[in-house]
Amino acid sequence: MAVVSVDDLTIAYGNHTVIDHLSFSINEGDFLVVVGENGVGKTTLVRSMLGFLKPKSGTISIPQSTRLGYVPQFRNIDEEYPLSIRDFVALNTKPRLLPWLTKSEQNRVEQMIRENNLTKIAERPLGLASGGEKQRAYLAQALLPNPNLLILDESTASLDNEMKYELLDLVTRFQQNGLSVMFITHDWDLAEQYGTRFLYLSPGSYSTGPINELPSPIKGDKK
């Protein structure tokens, strides 16, 4: 069953077409890697899927049963940011009038803290966390409301190799339990190692399929 279906999607900025007649779907349990050079529309596609950008034509069909989670590449959080990692994760609880968390919400926060390897640093101010720790906190926050589709927008770009693998190993653990993942990346090695399917965007065209069908010319274009 598809958690997202994109059909004949065209997105343009003025007279400049960024995405042209794109069609693909993400099914339950997919780990879709989206690859391509800068400027081919990867982030534009994400912004449109999140509802921030209206396409020129085509459709993005997201069933009511699909719940989106999103982890960006970067957030402007400096050393003075006051919240602990635990409190930051808890920010993604359902808005309501009560100023405190229910018992079930507290349990869910602790579950995400534990499952994202944050227990030992949960009281650390987020502003003092390392890049990898921050990304795990962003992941825990995104997963708190139990989404079934997680979008990672260049979420490993600023991390060293060890932290990249740690983050994606965590994501894969959730994916193997049914989470669908859409991972935008420039890292071809990560794409091939973690993806189950690929979407390759290039100027004016695209290709998609199982990760083992990633065309050889694209593999030779690694950076």
State each model region's role.
Residues 150-153:
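Catalytic Walker B motif of ABC-type/P-loop ATPase nucleotide-binding domains
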Residues 161-163:
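Helix N-cap at the start of a conserved alpha-helix in ABC-type nucleotide-binding domains
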Residues 50:
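Helix-to-loop junction immediately C-terminal to a conserved catalytic motif
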Residues 103-121:
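Conserved ABC ATPase "signature" region
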Residues 125-129:
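Conserved ABC ATPase signature
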Residues 185-186:
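H-loop/switch region of ABC-family ATPase nucleotide-binding domains
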Residues 196-211:
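H-loop (His-switch) and adjacent beta-strand-loop-beta switch element
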